[in-house]
Amino acid sequence: GVLHPITQGEWEVTDFVGLRGDKVYYISTESSPLKRDLYRVGLDGKHKERLTPGDGYYSIYPSADLSYYICEGGDSSAPGRTDVFNAAGKRVRTLYDNAPLKEALAEAGLPVREFFTFTTERGDELNGYMLKPLDFDPAKRYPVLLTQYSGPGSQQVAEGWGPDWEDALVTHGYIVVCVDPRGTGYRGEEFKKLTYGNLGRLEVEDQISTARYMA
């Protein structure tokens, strides 16, 4: 027989969660390369549904028969939550909603990642995020620190929540910017393999383009 894809589109399936009856459960970047959502679709490719509760970055831990699964995650604006869902995507129990931590962070104040996309002088679209001081004044100029990793297939610009040293630096009056250059992951095979056999050149070019964009 001839094999046919169940799904298709300009996005990646990042994980196969399981098969229950005639439904396939999988995680993909369909809404954005920055996000991970759980989807369910028939083996015939029809009746596709997104099951995760909202746009964000989620991890899924299914039971053996996929009658239930644990959904953990959220977006970059606040700590995520952990819930149990049934196979139909209905929340049946909240294990942890991080409410105490959310209240404490609301009082303390933390910068929120601002995501952006820009086009380099070579015509490549790159995704990035920016952290600004809480008292940011658009009329002022600030020192900018570019942070990056850029390893093949990696990703630093994503919707998941998780404060790091960058948040501390922002409190001292810096803007922190991170951009995933050519060769990083979750934007398709062609984009990821642009640096194959040529590590170090394109990544540096894209960081220079980022600095020019921020100037």
What is each model feature region?
Residues 34-36, 42, 66-68:
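C-terminal structured "cap/appendage" subdomains that terminate the fold
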Residues 24-25, 69:
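Hydrophobic beta-strand positions that form the internal "hydrophobic ladder"
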Residues 19-21, 64-65:
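Residue-level detector of Asp-centered blade-edge/turn motifs that repeat once per structural unit
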Residues 28-30, 154:
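Short, conserved, GDST-rich strand-edge loop motifs in beta-rich repeat architectures
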Residues 1-15, 20, 31, 41-58, ...:
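Multi-bladed beta-propeller domains
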Residues 36-38, 46, 80-82:
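Repetitive beta-architecture junctions, highlighting loop-to-beta-strand starts
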Residues 30-35, 75-78:
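Short, solvent-exposed loop/turn segments at conserved positions within beta-propeller repeat blades
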Residues 59-215:
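Serine-hydrolase catalytic core recognition
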